[in-house]
A protein has these predicted regions:
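Sec/Tat signal peptide C-region and signal peptidase I cleavage site
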Residues: 8-14
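Surface-exposed strand-loop-strand hairpins of Gram-negative outer-membrane beta-barrel proteins
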Residues: 16-20, 48-71, 105-110
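Residues on the lipid-exposed face of transmembrane beta-strands in outer-membrane beta-barrel proteins
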Residues: 31, 43, 74-78, 119-124, ...
C-alpha cells in the first residue's frame, strides 16, 4: 500500500510516497520577516483531513481511504544582535506532537507520538523599509515515533535537509505579499529500503492590514522533483504534487499575534487531497 504523508513531521502510512517532511501551509503572513533581536515562542495547532488518495492522474485511487491528523508544535526562536553578511543571525527549534488516524480497506490505526524535531542554528535575516528577507537550513532529525510494522507513524525514520528562502513585501498602504521557498533533500529510510525524492514547495500569502487585523488569501504549492527509489516505486517515480488556497486572518495585540487559516487542496497527484485548519499563536518573551 502506498504512503500517506500529512501534517507535522510527515505522518505516514506504510512507505514514504505522497508528501514531504514539512507541514505545507504552516507559514503565511510575514513568512519572510524574522522578528527583531530577542526570544520568541510560536505555537502551531493544525488539523488535516482527507478522504481521497489520488493517483498520478489526479483521480481517487484508494476506496474507503481516510486520514485525520492533529498536530501541535512548539517553536522557539532566538535572534541575536550579531550580523553575518549584513544579516541578523538567529536560530530556532520545532518540537511536534502528532496524532494520526488512517483507514484503508481492511485496515485502520490511530497513533499518537513525538514527531521529528526540526533545528536550524544559522538563520540570517535582512530588513529594509518595505522588504524583509530570510534564509536558513532546516534539519529534520529522525527522533519521532516510528515502527515499520505500524500503519501510521508520527516520525519518518530518515533525515531531511531543507534550504529555505523567504521574503515579505509591505507597501506604504499596508498591503502584504509573503512567500517562503523550500527545497528538501532526503536520506534513505533503511528500515524500508526506501528513499524519497527531492521536493520543492512554497507557502504564500497576500493580504491587507486594517488596524490590528490583516485579512487575505494564502496556501501552498508542492511538487516532487526527483523519483522515489525503493522496491515499491511505480513507473512514475511516485512523484507527488498539490496546490492549496484559502482565507487567512491575523490579529496583533500588545506583542502577541493570532493567526487563523483554512486551506483547501486541489489538483493532488500521488498523495491525499483534503483540507487543513490552522491556529498560530506568537509572543515575545
Amino acid at each position: 500500500m502506498c504512503a500517506v504523508l500529512c501534517g507535522f513531521a510527515g505522518m505516514a502510512l506504510a512507505t514514504e510516497m505522497g508528501g514531504g517532511a514539512y507541514p505545507n501551509g504552516a507559514e503565511g503572513f510575514f513568512a519572510g520577516a524574522v522578528p527583531p533581536p530577542g526570544t520568541y515562542f510560536i505555537n502551531y495547532f493544525t488539523y488535516y483531513t482527507a478522504d481521497s488518495f489520488n493517483d498520478s492522474s489526479g483521480h481517487s485511487s484508494v476506496p474507503g481511504f481516510r486520514v485525520d491528523a492533529v498536530g501541535n508544535v512548539f517553536r522557539f526562536v532566538h535572534v541575536t544582535n550579531k550580523k553575518v553578511l549584513g544579516g541578523l543571525w538567529g536560530m530556532h527549534v520545532f518540537v511536534p506532537l502528532v496524532n494520526v488516524s488512517v483507514r484503508v480497506p481492511g485496515l485502520s490505526e490511530s497513533r499518537f507520538g513525538l514527531g521529528d524535531i526540526i533545528v536550524d542554528p544559522f538563520i540570517l535575516s535582512w530588513h529594509s523599509k518595505n522588504w524583509h528577507w530570510a534564509t536558513g537550513l532546516d534539519i529534520y532529525v529522525p527522533v519521532g515515533t516510528y515502527d515499520k510494522t505500524h500503519l501510521a507513524n508520527p516520525g519518518r525514520n530518515y533525515w531531511t535537509f531543507e534550504p529555505v528562502v523567504g521574503f515579505t513585501f509591505l507597501s506604504g498602504n499596508n498591503f502584504e505579499i509573503s512567500c517562503k521557498f523550500m527545497y528538501d533533500i532526503n536520506t534513505e529510510n533503511n528500515d524500508m529500503d526506501y528513499k524519497s525524492g527531492q521536493e520543492f514547495h512554497l507557502d504564500y500569502a497576500v493580504g491587507k492590514k486594517f488596524g490590528n487585523t490583516t485579512v487575505g488569501l494564502g496556501g501552498y504549492y508542492y511538487t516532487q522533483i526527483t523519483d522515489d527509489k525503493g522496491p515499491t516505486v511505480g513507473p512514475d517515480g511516485n512523484k507527488g504534487m498539490v496546490f492549496a488556497i484559502g482565507p487567512q486572518v491575523k490579529y496583533d495585540s500588545k506583542g502577541r499575534s493570532f493567526v487563523f487559516s483554512y486551506q483547501k487542496e486541489i489538483s493532488a497527484e500521488n498523495r491525499p487531497e483534503g483540507q487543513k485548519f490552522w491556529f498560530k499563536y506568537i509572543c515575545a518573551f
